[in-house]
Amino acid sequence: MRKYFVYCFAWLLLLSGCHWFSKKESRPRPDVSTLDIKLVSKRFDKDLFMLRTLEFDMWKQQMLERYGEFYYFYLDNFVIGPRPAGDTSDVEEAALRQFVTDRYVRTIQDSIESVFPDTRQQEQELLQAFRYFKYYIPEFQTPEVLYFNSIYSAGSSPFGKKQLVIGLDMFLGDGNHDYDSVGVFQYLRHKMKPAYVSRYAVESLFDAYFENGINPEQNTLEAMVDRGRKIYFLSYVFPDAPDSLLLGYTQKQTEFCRSSEKEIWKFLNDKDVLLKNNSMDKTRYLGEAPTTSGMPAEAPGNIGSFIGLQIVRSYMKETGGAVSLHDLLTKYPAKTIFEKSKYRP
């Protein structure tokens, strides 16, 4: 099977001249410039380190006014741990002052400020993405964006109903040496760059908004289709983004998937995993990994996302514009989407 894959991959690349990667859907792009979206963003990471030069009570009052409950969340989860009942101001101050002067923490913050002296680029990307999100999902409410230092533990996540928190330290670039010391796998690092900040921020909002995740009641194929729906939505929110960024693959991995789509589909069918509800299979084909077991090294992990995306694209093409993006996400079961997609790579 591996030899067959390698032969087909090389042969198809020779014929295609590697143009598969640049082949994308062409569709009208709506004008969202007039949508009334106001993006408020704050640098919790920088404000936190202002404690080094300020009186504690005044600083804390300012932090609570600006960040609300996220201040206590950060304190409990990154600085001090669960606080005892009663007045803990003295404990807070001692722990926070130790935290902001800690050599390791300061090194991470220095790296953040070196890569992100400001977040204007990310805010431009997020503002445009939120406009598209609002256009396609009118009930979408724009969150306040908080950037913070997660000590290499958290990327992007909604916080409550009105805030989105982004750990900038998870997007410092694959050359960041600290990623070695904290054990970040090499195969993940191409996604830990500034270009991915807005993409993963919007994905986290999508997951929260649609309560998206792998449904334990679904078979593997249905889980792939649902993942494909999410990636397809991201392609509308980021219309200029290449498939590699949307899928989280490298360019070479994306080229492999494009040129070997038929063989990938055959491989999954031959494995007889698509119509079974097996959590290990879902993890194997939809989870993060350096590659997919049984396939060539060029194949990415999480290869089910690519197949799911292609099924959804086929479905939307078959509907001829009769199904809106909103309806795609909310009305139709994954099984129906696959059956009506007439997917035949």
Regions found by a protein language model. Give the residues of each.
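Sec-exported extracytoplasmic/periplasmic mature domains
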Residues: F49, K134-P138, L234-P242, N269-V273, ...
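Residue-level recognition of alpha-helix termini/interfacial anchor residues
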Residues: M63-N77, Y136, K252, F256-E261, ...
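Acidic/His-rich structured neighborhood in mature extracellular/periplasmic domains
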Residues: E93-T254, V323, T330-A334
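Sec-dependent signal peptide recognition
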Residues: R2-A10
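N-terminal mature-domain "stem" immediately C-terminal to a signal peptide or N-terminal signal-anchor/transmembrane
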Residues: H19-E93
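Acidic/His/Gly-enriched intrinsically disordered linker/tail segments
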Residues: R229-T292
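C-terminal soluble interaction/assembly domains
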Residues: L275-P345
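C-terminal motif of bacterial Sec signal peptides marking the signal peptidase cleavage site
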Residues: L14-G17
